[in-house]
UniProtKB/Swiss-Prot annotation:
PROSITE patterns noted in UniProt: RIBOSOMAL_L32E
One Pfam family from the record: Ribosomal_L32e
Protein's name according to its UniProt entry: Large ribosomal subunit protein eL32
Family matches, as InterPro entries: Ribosomal_eL32, Ribosomal_eL32_arc, Ribosomal_eL32_CS, Ribosomal_eL32_sf
One Gene Ontology CC term in the entry: cytosolic large ribosomal subunit
Organism: Methanosarcina acetivorans (strain ATCC 35395 / DSM 2834 / JCM 12185 / C2A)
Originating gene: rpl32e
Superkingdom of source: Archaea
A biological-process GO annotation: translation
Keywords, in A-Z order: Ribonucleoprotein, Ribosomal protein
Record-linked NCBIfam families: PRK08562.1
Protein family: Belongs to the eukaryotic ribosomal protein eL32 family.
GO molecular function: structural constituent of ribosome
Amino acid sequence: MDPESRRLFNVRKVQKGKKPQFKRTCSHKFKRLDDNWRRPRGSQGKQRRKYVSKGALVQVGYGSPAAVKGLHPSGYSDVLISSIAELELVDPSYEAIRIAGTIGAQKKALILAKAEEAGIKVLNSGRSE
């Protein structure tokens, strides 16, 4: 990983630490309302009017740097694999694989062996590295 990417990963880590938990308005009051974010649209809504005590609104400024957005903390791009044939499409220089949960133990062992042979990093191998 080059120094600029490493710096951007550190920036992302700091930004994620400062990011508030974006919660749905009044989700703590009603059991039927999930915490998942919904934009407040009421005409008199306190959260929409940006009252500090009512929680933060989702805004562009909370986002990660574009160069490292969506990347795994190891610096690799995450690729979901569900067959051995899909391994041939992976570029080990910037992509790492994650084996799908629907794969059985026997096929997973074959994929792990083939990935190790090709020098591809596996993110959910089940082994501590």
